């Protein structure tokens, strides 16, 4: 049985830990509010851009490389994770799904490559010997498009240059503060752009082909940025939940330890009384 001093030390340690996890929960809650608003505010922009691209694409008869399927010799995987843990299964879930897809689809490392966003994903793939052709870490919580523009641009350019022939995106989609869904999306080629059912009449200058030449890369880059915003909101939600659970667990442990402490203290006092009574009886 642990001594009173040991139990008291464990109680103090768990109280300090619960204070830390509670503070982290509050920080994550604050960050979640901002990240969620930013992710939601980006949706109308994406919807309008998709509407324009779809309306052009539905009548486009050319063969833009970003809209045309070609024989797949190599597949790219853009995987978005966090730079740190303490977020429950946030990183593990998306990495597990991406790794599973790679194992299912490919026999050789020459058939695929990973673009890793986030330190957790980069370290995961490198540890397993999976080729990482591009990486980005240290992304701020208040991420802006200018921060990830080079990565998004180079990713799209690698597809255009046929470094890979298709690109899949893996990230955590934000559903609510208590729910995030691992999402797999085929990003390139852009063959699944659904035209607007209520077709909007646009006049294009100079012509559709030149507009697509500029708009399609921007659209693909915006999809990447939108997924990153979504992932950031999911990360803060997952960390907030994980820290709340950790705080609750610490409180339960503290309650159990305090009960053990009181029982041990009571047993110690009883033992002392018994010894005093026994000693007094021996003197009579």
Curated annotation (Swiss-Prot):
GO molecular function list: ATP binding; proton-transporting ATP synthase activity, rotational mechanism
Signal peptide: none
Domain of life: Bacteria
One Pfam family in the UniProt entry: ATP-synt
Keyword terms of this UniProt record: ATP synthesis, Cell membrane, CF(1), Hydrogen ion transport, Ion transport, Membrane, Transport
GO cellular component: plasma membrane; proton-transporting ATP synthase complex
InterPro entries for this protein: ATP_synth_F1_ATPase_gsu (IPR035968), ATP_synth_F1_gsu (IPR000131), ATP_synth_F1_gsu_CS (IPR023632)
Membrane topology: Peripheral membrane protein
First-listed, main subcellular location of the protein, grouped into a coarse class: membrane
Keyword Ion transport applies: yes
BP terms from Gene Ontology: proton motive force-driven plasma membrane ATP synthesis
Subcellular location: Cell membrane
Record function comment: Produces ATP from ADP in the presence of a proton gradient across the membrane. The gamma chain is believed to be important in regulating ATPase activity and the flow of protons through the CF(0) complex.
Family listed: Belongs to the ATPase gamma chain family.
Subunit comment: F-type ATPases have 2 components, CF(1) - the catalytic core - and CF(0) - the membrane proton channel. CF(1) has five subunits: alpha(3), beta(3), gamma(1), delta(1), epsilon(1). CF(0) has three main subunits: a, b and c.
HAMAP family: ATP_synth_gamma_bact (MF_00815)
PANTHER family per record: ATP SYNTHASE GAMMA CHAIN, ATP SYNTHASE SUBUNIT GAMMA, MITOCHONDRIAL
The protein, known as: ATP synthase gamma chain
Organism: Bacillus licheniformis (strain ATCC 14580 / DSM 13 / JCM 2505 / CCUG 7422 / NBRC 12200 / NCIMB 9375 / NCTC 10341 / NRRL NRS-1264 / Gibson 46)
